[in-house]
Amino acid sequence: MTDLAARLARPGPMTAVELRPPRRGLDTARSMDFWIDMYHAVQRFARQGTFVLLTDDAAGDAEEESLAHLAANLGDGSDFGTVVPFLTCKHPLEYCRMFARRAAALGTAGVAVVG
């Protein structure tokens, strides 16, 4: 049982946080600032044991691909066990499979598939 499944099975309230990557098309400086803030937030929440639900175009806005950025910039040794990336079914099947493989390789708590 994953940490997320175990936590969901326990009685009592649970706190989780949803974060969204920046919209595509931001200028470079604004996009970099956004990602730096997001990395710090994910690291802080991971240290606290708070699950982070990380959307990726889930709201229909064109957003940058979150999983690739996190893998590249959080660094080796980062705990992805509290990160739950969202995957929307609007992507081609091969992309969905690749996304799930990458999420598993990072050690994420799971993948939320939305439709």
Regions found by a protein language model. Name each.
Residues 2-115:
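Active-site beta->alpha loop and helix N-cap motifs at the rims of alpha/beta catalytic domains
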